[in-house]
């Protein structure tokens, strides 16, 4: 696809006429936009809800504050939503000038190890302008299916363990990590992050450690502990994280609760034994119980080349409800 059109449309119009900074006390228009597709927009909403204040231009709207057609978080990474339009909801696509203006705005705000992520069609729209302006990618992941967990009477975990009763100890051990267990959780989180993104996040300073601690404090980091050898940890015995999953994004939207799982990880020596599936099924139930309600949506996204993970999710009944893309910088 050619993005030369960005150069030809509206270059004489000031960028400020295309983008509207969203103050932290005037988010209702953006939230209404996101409510049209809460599963796809939950990452953007998470950022706006986590921070009570932000700098001018950290959140921007396209099309005005009251009824924007698109919006984006632009601090270190870029999270766009709505650029490609949502005709089923009567929303037009952002025009070429608006998309170029967003790319120009975000370009100087992207960090060395940031990303552009969100619905694949929205990422594709803005990435063309960014690349034209000289932004280079470390890795492009254009097919990341968004999957949603099924609603199962009696709970997904219980239904799964009826098929795998030998793993009952796993499902029964799933719980939110405690603050005094942060030192146990952090190495597992770092291993997951390093394997997924290719570098140790702790080398960039204390930010990642703070994020892991924050998730634990919010009761959004779920773990299974074992004795280090794939057996239930007994009182007084050594303990290790066998499995973990985080609620990376969370929103109680007008149409119901939505959670997005991130950081799903099974310790390498335990993979292929069914432990990950048993634990994840129990996590889905726990997230509904603790955060989004019985009818809430629990979703995640996965690289399409991660065949083992896709097989695991589908074995539990997860179904595709969207498509994300991530461009790593």
Language-model regions, residue ranges each:
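Conserved active-site alpha-helix within GNAT-family acetyltransferase domains
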Residues: 121-140, 277, 304-322
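Conserved donor-binding loop and adjoining core beta-sheet/short helix segment
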Residues: 12-15, 21-22, 32-38, 46-115, ...
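Conserved beta-strand-loop-alpha-helix junction that forms the acyl-donor binding cleft
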Residues: 117-123, 268, 298-310, 327-329
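Conserved acetyl-CoA-binding loop-helix of GNAT-fold acetyltransferases
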Residues: 92-105, 262-268, 272-289, 310-315
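Conserved GNAT acetyl-CoA-binding A-motif
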Residues: 110-120, 257, 287-302, 324
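Short amphipathic alpha-helix that is part of the acyltransferase structural core
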Residues: 1-44, 158-202
């Amino acid at each position: 696809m050619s993005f030369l059109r960005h150069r030809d449309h509206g270059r004489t119009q000031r960028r400020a006429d295309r983008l509207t900074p969203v103050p932290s006390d005037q988010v209702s228009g953006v939230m209404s936009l996101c409510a049209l597709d809460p599963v796809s927009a939950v990452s953007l909403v998470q950022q706006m809800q986590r921070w009570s204040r932000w700098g001018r231009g950290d959140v921007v709207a396209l099309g005005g504050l009251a009824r924007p057609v698109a919006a984006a978080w632009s601090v270190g990474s870029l999270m766009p939503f709505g650029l490609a339009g949502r005709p089923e909801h009567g929303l037009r696509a952002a025009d070429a000038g608006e998309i170029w203006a967003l790319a120009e705005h975000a370009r100087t705000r992207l960090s060395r190890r940031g990303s552009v992520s969100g619905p694949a069609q929205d990422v594709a729209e803005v990435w063309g302008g960014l690349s034209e302006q000289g932004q280079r990618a470390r890795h492009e992941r254009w097919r990341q299916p968004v999957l949603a967990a099924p609603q199962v009477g009696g709970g997904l975990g219980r239904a799964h363990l009826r098929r795998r009763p030998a793993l009952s100890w796993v499902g029964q051990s799933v719980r939110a990590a405690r603050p005094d267990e942060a030192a146990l959780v952090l190495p597992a989180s770092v291993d997951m992050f390093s394997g997924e993104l290719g570098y140790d996040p702790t080398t960039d300073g204390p930010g990642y450690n703070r994020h892991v601690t924050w998730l634990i404090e919010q009761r959004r980091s779920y773990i299974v502990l074992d004795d280090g050898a794939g057996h239930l940890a007994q009182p007084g015995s050594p303990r290790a994280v066998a499995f973990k999953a985080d609620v990376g994004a969370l929103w109680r939207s007008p149409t119901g609760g939505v959670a997005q799982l991130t950081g799903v990880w099974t310790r390498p020596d335990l993979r292929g034994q069914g432990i990950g599936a048993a634990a994840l099924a129990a996590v889905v139930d726990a997230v509904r119980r603790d955060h989004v309600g019985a009818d809430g949506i629990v979703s995640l996204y996965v690289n399409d080349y991660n065949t083992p993970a896709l097989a695991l999710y589908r074995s539990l009944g997860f179904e595709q409800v969207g498509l994300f893309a991530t461009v790593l910088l």
